[in-house]
């Protein structure tokens, strides 16, 4: 199977990954379950690769996977991805994110991980 279903149907899974991707770009590091982090890592690497091309078409493709909300008064999530994050990785060919396993969650002992940009 090329992807994990994360215990959700297609629309719920897409909304979850969209929210996690938006949060990752805004905060540049988030803590989530290990399986969600691994799925998000695939999407995040594709998004950074898209942002390095920086054309109208790639902006529209990236907008499909993000909530383009304002971070502060003059910056949106899409602008941060295409200006700040992509400029860090111009010479890098892949592996833009890393997943670090942490201690299990206290309530249900779910395996947790931190996903962050390298």
UniProtKB/Swiss-Prot annotation:
Keywords: Ribonucleoprotein, Ribosomal protein. It comes from the Bacteria. One of its GO terms (cellular component) is large ribosomal subunit. One of its GO terms (biological process) is translation. One of its GO terms (molecular function) is structural constituent of ribosome. Pfam families: Ribosomal_L17. Signal peptide: none annotated. Part of the 50S ribosomal subunit. Contacts protein L32. Belongs to the bacterial ribosomal protein bL17 family. This is Large ribosomal subunit protein bL17. It comes from Aster yellows witches'-broom phytoplasma (strain AYWB). The gene is rplQ.
